[in-house]
Amino acid sequence: MFFVPACSFKNEIDSNYYCQKLKLTCTKGNKIIYFKTSKGDFEVKLLGKDYPVTVSNFLENINNNIYKNKKFYKIINYPQIKFIHGGVNPENEFYIEQNQTLNKTSASIPLEIKFKEEIKPRYNYQIKNPNETKNLVNTFESGSIAMVKSGKNKSSSTEFFFVTSKIPELDGRYSIFGKII
């Protein structure tokens, strides 16, 4: 009989696999993008170094003008939860039309989260123990941008949201891929 004093997650799939599968040019560095809105302009730092698949997908959407002249179509302003939902509503005719012309093989991308002390992000990993969120590289705080979920371990390929306050209940459940700067 023997005892295992510690155990770690073996992360064999890397971002190149998903970038090839989704036909994305994989971004490995951080990028700054600009949002111009009727309520004011702001910059967002995209964390391509830590979340290459999600950032690559988002940049492809920008390059394909999928967000151009679109509205933030849902604003949630409850006392404990505040967020702004943007992107293209997948039930919208425009999305269905555009998705067919984009270089997309799927309407979803893998859930992508990264833990401290790990080199690569984890894909489609579901956090089961709340204590695991303490080791996440990024958590939801005011200004975080993340992809909406389209299934248990999948993120939408076009819908995103910003949070306007700290929301620890969402940590590890969505792909946070940037922050307003």
What are these regions (language model features)?
Residues 1-3:
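Bacterial N-terminal signal peptides
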